[in-house]
Amino acid sequence: MTDSTYDVNRVRAYLQGLQMRIADALGAFDGTPLAADTWRRGPGERLRGGGCTRILEAGGFFERAGIGFSDVAGDALPPSASASRPQLAGRGFEALGVSLVLHPRNPYCPTVHMNVRMLIATKPGEAPVFWFGGGMDLTPIYGFEEDARHFHRTCRAALEPFGAELYPRFKKWCDDYFFLKHRNEARGIGGIFFDDFSELGFERSFEMLQSVGDAFLPSYLPIVERRRDTPYGERERAFQAYRRGRYVEFNLVFDRGTLFGLQSGGRTESILLSMPPTAGWRYDWHPDPGTPEARLQSEFLVPRDWA
């Protein structure tokens, strides 16, 4: 994080290309192209810059799919970005990244989240400080070991060229991060998560970021290809809404990206792109023992060595 030699133009070009590749692939899979919403911040707003949101709602397969690119700058890092680095509080910053969340309609197809980003903190008279962050995680409604192993093995393969220790380190980080403390339960089966990362220097750290971004489609599309035609009914949709409620709770209470966006004066529509189209809550409800719904909690929403 102290190496100030970096090339933000290369990072920007990669991220814009990644968004386009993923959006095209998702549109082809769904049968409906993702719409494009290009935006820029206006004069006098807290942030400068802009981005592009690719969005699909009520598609053939995806009930909601959003993938956003943003490149914004501000005069002071928000508290969520400088909490672990108080020495950077108050610095100017540039933040650029791609973030996506996909909510399939079929409850047997998992929700997925992926994010890759770069932040640069600046202060007049001092060298800029940069770091990378990101990862991907899977949130099944109904658990399948085959799917969990495929997802985690793809994540592990993406990180292996950069050090055998990275996957177990980033997996634990993900398990710890995507956890609803007030519920004492995991959001999903995890994946990988990293932040404040530049320890390999700019070139290798950027290569690692690209490897993670490039691994998204092969990590996810084979899973939903297997499950997309699985029959379901009202019971499964009701449980899906219940689990989506947990997703909403995490994103609004704990997620650093959501908090960063809201605290920095970000674009609300883009920040809340991760929200499911429907969600539900039931008072003190618990699935019956021995059901697939109970099995999700006992066998999948616990840290496991999936890879």
Curated annotation (Swiss-Prot):
One of its GO terms (cellular component) is cytoplasm. It is found in: Cytoplasm. GO terms for molecular function: coproporphyrinogen oxidase activity; metal ion binding; protein homodimerization activity. It is an enzyme of class 1 (oxidoreductase). Residues 247-282 are annotated as: Important for dimerization. InterPro entries: Coprogen_oxidase_aer, Coprogen_oxidase_aer_sf, Coprogen_oxidase_CS. Its cofactor is a divalent metal cation. GO terms for biological process: protoporphyrinogen IX biosynthetic process. Keywords: Cytoplasm, Heme biosynthesis, Metal-binding, Oxidoreductase, Porphyrin biosynthesis. It catalyses: coproporphyrinogen III + O2 + 2 H(+) = protoporphyrinogen IX + 2 CO2 + 2 H2O. Pathway: Porphyrin-containing compound metabolism; protoporphyrin-IX biosynthesis; protoporphyrinogen-IX from coproporphyrinogen-III (O2 route): step 1/1. Substrate binds at residues 99, 115-117, 265-267. The active site is at residue 113. The record marks 182 as: Important for dimerization. A divalent metal cation binds at residues 103, 113, 152, 182. HAMAP family: Coprogen_oxidas. Belongs to the aerobic coproporphyrinogen-III oxidase family. Homodimer. Involved in the heme biosynthesis. Catalyzes the aerobic oxidative decarboxylation of propionate groups of rings A and B of coproporphyrinogen-III to yield the vinyl groups in protoporphyrinogen-IX. This is Oxygen-dependent coproporphyrinogen-III oxidase. It comes from Burkholderia pseudomallei (strain K96243). The gene is hemF.
